[in-house]
Amino acid sequence: MKVAISYPPLEPAPGVPLLGQNRQFQWFSSPTYIYPVVPASAATLLQEREHQVLWDDGIASEKSYTSWFQEIVSAAPDVIAMETKTPVVKRHWAIVDQLKKQLPGTKVVLMGDHVTALPEESLDRSAVDFVLTGGDYDFLLQGLCEHLTGQESVLPPGIWYREGSRISNTGSFQLNQDLDDLPTIDRNLTRWQLYSEENGNFRRTPGAYVMAGRDCWHHRCTFCSWTTLFPTWRRRSPERVLDEVGHLIEQYGVREIMDDTGTFPVGDWLHTFCKGMIARGYNQQVTLDCNMRFDALSRDDYELMKRAGFRLLLFGLESANPETLRRVSKGLTVEQIVDSCEAAQAAGLYPHVTIMFGYPWESYEDALHTLNLGRELLVKGHAYTVQATIVIPYPGTPLFQECKANDWLNTTNWSRYDMREPVMKTPMSDAQVKKLVQGIYNVAFNPEFVARRLLSVRGWDDMRYFWRAGRKVMGHLIDFARE
């Protein structure tokens, strides 16, 4: 069976869509391509089962829609699987319908957090054949293809489909597969080079993405779209992840690896992994980045991670207001945020913080507390970089349900959930929300901030990184200046 895993170009577009491997969707002015780990695992698993796999990322390949469409029609796959998200699902419905007109015998599949939350909607609104729910696209797509080829008589749980004129499903998705059973991702099949340079996280290139777990052991943040995909927590063994790190170093010359697990494993798992990095000598060959929670690690943990080769730790700050931290179930205090940043920085690590503006219950004065904390952490060097965004309540999240219950939604036109404007009612104007986002990125022009960055330069990798980072900052300022 010929199977295409496709990311169609989206035209017209206000920028590059951050779709695959993204918990939030944005259009970026500056080209950014992030390796979609689970779809890449799906491609590898299908190829191992002797299917013919076409890795078809028209976005990262920078194809026009016309070229992409002509090529996919010419290839005539038996199955086309596409990952979608809330702001672009209507575009994908139109693409699905065009594909079904040209390739009526091809089965078209949608997967992602939006269709997991609202699976029946896509079957009602488009000619799509199957909707995969939950985040295990690899296991589910394999099960679907084996069913279509007659190898399995029953579809796995979590699949929605048509049965005549009726919409049916196989029940709730299950996340009970052992992640260590998955094969090592075939990076050549999935064209890893497309994603190895244009990424703001990478200080050294080429870079690569991996995932030690699915997805976050906290998994309670009310705004996170991936809690819809992964309501439970699983992780691979430290040895399997170490083997993948070695594979990326030895086979592809990768110099920086981003582990995009929602929150990297801690405790004994982390200690075993770090000691393995040191024992195998990988800490001398590659730099590691990961997502982490404030107050999850001790100073000794940070120091061990530094010795193991970690560089960038991405923390979700989200707000400096205790009431907001409570309402979105962060389980944090402002003091823990500051202490963790200082401890990580003191160990020689580089904290990156994410901040959001536009909560329905926050006034402009409330949001200024967050802006001021973010600016202070950056200027004083306790945080190295920042990402600021507008809060978007994605379907399937507790925040979306809270918005519906309190009449906080300005619209349910999904295309407007693309972070170019607030879609929740707030005490602030849209212009004020965007001004707050820009206010964080304007720290890049602060003299003390600039001086600290210049003093941190250690070589050509740093200079190239700062050049790329400067372009990204200007892009973000443009992104949130648009009307």
Ranges and model annotations:
Residues 78, 129, 255, 311, ...:
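Conserved acidic residues
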Residues 180-181, 185-352, 357-359, 372:
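Radical SAM [4Fe-4S] cluster-binding motif and immediate context
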Residues 12-16, 267-268, 323, 327-328, ...:
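Flexible glycine/acidic-rich beta-alpha junction loops that bind and position SAM and/or redox cofactors
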Residues 120-124, 301, 361-376:
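Catalytic cores of alpha/beta
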Residues 38, 45-46, 51-175, 392, ...:
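Glycine-rich beta-alpha loop elements in corrinoid/cobalamin-binding modules
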Residues 3-31:
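Short glycine-rich His-centered loop
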Residues 2-5, 72-73, 78, 398-400, ...:
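Radical SAM enzyme core and accessory elements
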